[in-house]
Amino acid sequence: MKSIYITGYMGAGKTTIGKALSKELHMDVIDTDQKIEEKQEKEIRDIFAEEGEMAFREYESEMLRSLPVENVIITTGGGIIEREENRKWMKENGTVVYLYCDPHVIAERLREDTTRPLFQKKDIDAFVMKFELRRAYYEEAHIHIDTTNKSVKQIMDELKEKINE
């Protein structure tokens, strides 16, 4: 089976759904952000602070290409889709899943989360604007799932149905 790439904006449920799907399909799950932190030996927020977003995006592209393209679920950072080369790579090497969640719901979830570098010191309008700028890229995915106000079970049922189509 080709890899399954789970994309979506921060807070949409990528990590949670990736873990749940991993159990259902008996496949390993790899988180690109976690792998970058391990390789760079620092947290993402520190990479952003010390090296900037462009350096992080380069690490992200390198990491994406280093991962297996079969029998694995890959949960991605929210901005991985900003680079056309990344979108193309994922579409050519697996099934891309876009987890959509209303940006106002996400903002409420993340308001106090200090581990989210692009959410820090941003107002809701700027957050929603960044979300909307990325939306067309996310929508290039093979499968779209709206996670807004849904349980993990509801999301998983819908995702399994769409994967098996």
Swiss-Prot record:
Mg(2+) binds at T15. It comes from Bacillus cereus (strain AH187). Transmembrane segments: none annotated. Its EC number is 2.7.1.71. It comes from the Bacteria. Belongs to the shikimate kinase family. ATP binds at G11, A12, G13, K14, T15, T16, R116. CDD domains: SK. It catalyses: shikimate + ATP = 3-phosphoshikimate + ADP + H(+). PANTHER family: SHIKIMATE KINASE, SHIKIMATE KINASE 1, CHLOROPLASTIC. Its cofactor is Mg(2+). Its main location: cytoplasm. Keywords: Amino-acid biosynthesis, Aromatic amino acid biosynthesis, ATP-binding, Cytoplasm, Kinase, Magnesium, Metal-binding, Nucleotide-binding, Transferase. Pathway: Metabolic intermediate biosynthesis; chorismate biosynthesis; chorismate from D-erythrose 4-phosphate and phosphoenolpyruvate: step 5/7. This is Shikimate kinase. It is found in: Cytoplasm. One of its GO terms (molecular function) is magnesium ion binding. Monomer. It holds the Pfam family SKI. One of its GO terms (cellular component) is cytosol. Substrate binds at D33, R57, G78, R134. Binds 1 Mg(2+) ion per subunit. GO terms for biological process: amino acid biosynthetic process; aromatic amino acid family biosynthetic process; chorismate biosynthetic process. Catalyzes the specific phosphorylation of the 3-hydroxyl group of shikimic acid using ATP as a cosubstrate.
